[in-house]
């Protein structure tokens, strides 16, 4: 050992004297800065120990190899373990170099360890993320009879915070307060951190406010805690207080505040913070990454790329944020290009990056790219990660290939399947395969795999059958999962969805502590089935219960006022939000705009819209829709133009709204302008936008443009297929409509009620009576869809156009549901065409009984009677019409 020590020291050009001085300096430095040791003041070093320690710790000498050489030299000189200062210094060097095993061996050789040496071990374990070992050593320290000091408590509380061990944290925190160490800065910051991570932000905030001299680290810890607890208001308030006070924000502060702006998509305030960052010169990689994340989450990818390009050496987080931003913006090809550049840059890719690029490929038009990414994932070994496997399952599900999703799931081992079974159940749900979801859940139980509240909630979200829902309900009662708040909420949502509102309300009442999500879900359930009074009453019950409604609950109540237009109720809710001071949120603002638009109060809707803190496509869409419904097409287009001119990229929902407005206008040029904008931003391939384009051109009478719009859609969905069928039907092209319908079925799509309206309408317009009967029967027999009055209207129209009026009457009388006024009105119109007076009288009488305020039935009957010269009855009909207060709408011309 002596030879080894001499040789090594000579090669490093370190003399024994220098070694002793170095270790002594280390000891003095650590004692003065970290351990508050009384012995540190007694050291009489002939040189500046701070400068010497800093020089050596920043050099190549501060590593494991050097530390072992120094230990060998000190052993040769018999200085270990008898020299306490040198032993502690060497212990600290082992800790700093990351070799805690060697540090533990050295600690065991110390004849009389003290609190300082114990602190070195506890801090070392914590520093190298060996948090459980840090807690064990803290317990060992008490077992050895040493009394912990502020350094001990600060380190062990930080370890508890990282482990998220609430019980042990509680014990240590109580003991810290009892021993009177809570006022030390190192303990205060650790307490703030542990309370924040254990969802006790109020306690963390109290510790912070009680602090006599909070440093920047304490400020950053409380701001990060507020961010972690999604208390964004506290983040901004603390940041403002910090800026006007004596503490100067650093890069960590700016990163936290920018993250809060990104979460709320507060671009305007984020730009203010960015300006302050530039002014202070705090643009490091962490802050720039936070700025990139802000722009990406707000949909401003050009600005995000500009900031990203200025980062000298982007980290893996920086690359991943850019990739995720393009994915969120539906720009999959840019996301793949970023991923390609990232691989060439040499940055180490992590599982978050991989899941982001996989998510970008989750669309029917990117099957080839999805396969290539999957192959790379398999080759690189990332497929062993559960989160990556879950992303692959979701990707194939969204691409429309649920079989490949299932294959990925089956290729996993039991542990991985346990972790992501919820993802598979959700994928089955999105692919409308509830049977497979139920079988998978049953298999989990049979194989002994653990089921939790997430598995049950995923399954309940799939079900639309009350009997199966009751079976799952029974399982939750047996397993005790029914006590979980999310499971209880999912159960009563299922009952509500299946039309069993009474059972749903019973379950709702059985939940002891209802959160806002429960109240909002029950209110939405009442709203869905038209129970306006009950929904509003439930909101009043919530207030009486002492629960303060959040934005989601208030938005649900406003949706009730929108679905069943009730302007007075809506104004009352708006007044409540103003009094409560919660009227500034984007979600609530959008709900208010939608409510006022649906209730016809467009002036108030525009006032709320103009006061929104940020431009919002959802609110814009609601207002455009309101303008369109009330004939203010030009106002809708002006609003759309203002949004585009401001540089805001409209989403598919806003585009669909303006296309519906264009379809209601008489100017095809407006629709063409919108189409040009859609082509420019690349949304023509989106199914929802393509369907709206198709419908617009159909109303303009351009069937060729309808076909072009359909051909541009990447992976047309059922809505797009149905829109094309309806377009052909509207233009009397029955054969083409039926060909599209058959092609749709060949592609694997199952028709719904709306699809059959288009099919039956095509048959009626083409006079295809037998085909109408066939498809009406197919609805029930092949797809289990019960026909509604709108389907029967098409059937009566087909019979009426073919002159089979008595058969149409017999068909109406044998309907499984009560015919409405439109059914009888359709027969009446056919009687007018074929001059069938007596049957026309019967049809008119039925239609007037059902809709006495509809002028159409009176006018049609009057015209039939006039054509056969029965003027007395014409006069009687007109008197009846006048007596009921019905007036014919006057004609108008745009010429």
Swiss-Prot record:
Alphabetized InterPro entries for the sequence: E_motif, Pentatricopeptide_rpt, PPR_At4g14850-like_plant, TPR-like_helical_dom_sf
GO cellular component term, pick one: mitochondrion
A molecular-function term among this protein's GO annotations: RNA binding
Transit peptide as recorded in UniProt: 1-71
Annotated transmembrane regions: none
Keywords for the protein's UniProt record, in alphabetical order: Chloroplast, Plastid, Repeat, Transit peptide
Ranges for region Type E motif: 824-895
Superkingdom assignment: Eukaryota
Mapped PPR repeat ranges: 83-113, 114-148, 149-183, 184-214, 215-249, 250-280, 284-314, 315-349, 350-384, 385-415, 417-451, 452-483, 484-514, 515-549, 550-584, 585-615, 616-650, 651-685, 686-716, 717-751, 752-787, 788-818
Pfam families referenced in this protein's UniProt entry, alphabetically: E_motif, PPR, PPR_2
Main location: plastid
GO BP field: mitochondrial mRNA modification
Family annotation (Gene3D superfamilies): Tetratricopeptide repeat domain (1.25.40.10)
SUPFAM superfamilies (UniProt xref): TPR-like (SSF48452)
Compartments in which it is found: Plastid, Chloroplast
Cross-referenced PANTHER family: PENTATRICOPEPTIDE REPEAT-CONTAINING PROTEIN (PTHR47926:SF477)
Family statement: Belongs to the PPR family. PCMP-E subfamily.
UniProt-recorded name of the protein: Pentatricopeptide repeat-containing protein At1g74600, chloroplastic
Organism for this UniProt entry: Arabidopsis thaliana (Mouse-ear cress)
Gene behind the chain: PCMP-E69
């Amino acid at each position: 050992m002596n030879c080894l020590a001499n040789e090594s020291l000579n090669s490093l050009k370190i003399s024994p004297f220098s070694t002793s001085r170095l270790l002594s300096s280390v000891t003095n430095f650590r004692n003065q800065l970290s351990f508050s040791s009384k012995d540190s003041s007694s050291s009489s070093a002939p040189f500046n120990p701070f400068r010497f320690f800093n020089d050596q710790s920043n050099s190549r000498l501060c590593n494991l190899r050097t530390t072992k050489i120094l230990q060998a030299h000190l052993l040769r000189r018999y200085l270990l373990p008898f020299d306490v200062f040198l032993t502690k210094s060497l212990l600290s060097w082992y800790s700093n170099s990351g070799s805690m095993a060697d540090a533990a061996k050295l600690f065991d050789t110390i004849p009389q360890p003290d609190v300082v040496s114990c602190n070195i071990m506890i801090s070392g374990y914590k520093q190298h993320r060996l948090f459980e070992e840090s807690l064990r050593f803290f317990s060992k320290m008490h077992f050895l009879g040493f009394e912990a000091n502020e350094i001990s408590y600060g380190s062990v509380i930080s370890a508890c915070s990282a482990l998220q061990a609430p019980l042990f944290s509680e014990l240590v925190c109580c003991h810290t307060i009892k021993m009177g160490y809570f006022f030390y800065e190192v303990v205060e910051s650790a307490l703030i951190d542990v309370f924040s991570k254990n969802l006790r932000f109020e306690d963390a905030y109290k510790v912070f406010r009680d602090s006599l001299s909070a440093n920047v680290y304490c400020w950053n810890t409380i701001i990060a805690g507020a961010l972690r607890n999604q208390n964004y208001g506290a983040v901004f308030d603390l940041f403002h207080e910090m800026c006007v006070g004596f503490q100067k924000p650093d890069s960590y502060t700016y990163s936290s505040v920018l993250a809060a702006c990104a979460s709320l998509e507060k671009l305007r305030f984020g730009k203010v913070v960015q300006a302050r960052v530039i002014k202070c010169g705090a643009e490091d990689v962490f802050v720039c990454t936070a700025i990139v994340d802000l722009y990406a989450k707000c949909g401003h990818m050009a600005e995000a790329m500009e900031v990203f390009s200025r980062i000298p050496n982007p980290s893996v987080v920086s690359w991943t944020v850019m990739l995720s931003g393009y994915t969120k913006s539906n720009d999959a090809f840019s996301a793949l290009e970023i991923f390609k550049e990232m691989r060439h840059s040499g940055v180490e890719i992590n599982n978050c990056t991989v899941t982001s690029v996989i998510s970008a490929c989750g669309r029917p038009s990117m099957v080839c790219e999805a396969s290539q990414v999957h192959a790379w994932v398999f080759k690189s070994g990332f497929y062993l990660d559960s989160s990556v496997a879950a992303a692959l399952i979701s990707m194939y599900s969204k691409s429309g290939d649920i079989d490949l999703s299932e294959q990925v799931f089956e290729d996993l081992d039991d542990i991985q399947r346990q972790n992501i079974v919820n993802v598979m159940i959700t994928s089955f749900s999105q692919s409308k395969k509830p049977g497979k979801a139920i079988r998978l859940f049953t298999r989990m139980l049979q194989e002994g795999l653990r089921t939790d509240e997430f598995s049950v909630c995923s399954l309940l979200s799939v079900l639309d059958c009350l009997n199966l829902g009751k079976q799952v309900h029974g399982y939750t009662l047996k397993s005790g999962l029914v006590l979980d708040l999310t499971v209880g909420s999912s159960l009563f949502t299922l009952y509500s969805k299946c039309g069993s509102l009474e059972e749903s309300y019973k379950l709702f009442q059985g939940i002891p502590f209802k959160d806002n999500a429960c109240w909002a879900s029950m209110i939405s359930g009442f709203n869905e089935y038209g129970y306006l009074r009950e929904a509003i009453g439930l909101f009043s019950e919530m207030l009486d219960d002492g629960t303060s409604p959040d934005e989601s609950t208030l938005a649900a109540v406003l949706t009730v006022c929108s679905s069943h237009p009730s302007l007075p109720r809506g104004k009352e809710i708006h007044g409540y939000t103003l009094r409560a001071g919660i009227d500034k949120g984007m979600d609530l603002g959008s709900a208010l705009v939608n409510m006022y638009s649906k209730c016809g109060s467009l002036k108030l809707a525009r006032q709320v819209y103009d006061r929104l803190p940020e431009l919002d496509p959802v609110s814009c869409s609601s207002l455009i829709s309101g303008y369109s419904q009330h004939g203010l097409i030009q106002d809708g287009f002006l609003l759309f133009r203002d949004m585009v001119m401001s540089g805001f990229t409209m989403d598919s929902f806003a585009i669909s709204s303006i296309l519906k407005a264009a379809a209601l206008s008489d100017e095809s040029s407006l629709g063409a302008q919108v189409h040009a904008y859609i082509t420019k931003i690349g949304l023509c391939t989106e199914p929802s936008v393509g369907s709206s384009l198709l419908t617009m051109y159909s109303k303009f009478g351009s069937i060729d443009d309808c076909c072009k719009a359909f051909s541009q859609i990447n992976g047309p969905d059922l809505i797009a297929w149905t829109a094309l069928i309806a377009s052909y039907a509207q233009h009397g092209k029955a054969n083409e409509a039926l060909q599209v319908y058959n092609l749709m079925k060949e592609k694997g799509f199952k028709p719904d009620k709306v699809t059959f309206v288009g099919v039956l309408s095509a048959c009626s317009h083409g006079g295809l009576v037998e085909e109408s009967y066939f498809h009406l029967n197919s609805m029930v027999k092949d797809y289990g869809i019960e026909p509604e009055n709108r389907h029967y209207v098409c059937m009566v129209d087909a019979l009426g156009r073919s002159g089979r009026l008595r058969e149409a009457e017999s068909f109406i009388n044998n309907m499984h549901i009560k015919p409405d006024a439109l059914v009888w009105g359709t027969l009446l119109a056919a009687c007018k065409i074929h001059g069938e007076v007596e049957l026309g009288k019967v049809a008119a009488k039925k239609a007037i009984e059902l809709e006495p305020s509809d002028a159409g039935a009176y006018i049609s009957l009057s015209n039939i009677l006039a054509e056969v010269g029965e003027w007395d009855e014409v006069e009687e009909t007109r008197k009846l019409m006048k007596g009921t207060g019905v007036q014919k709408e006057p004609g108008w011309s745009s010429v």
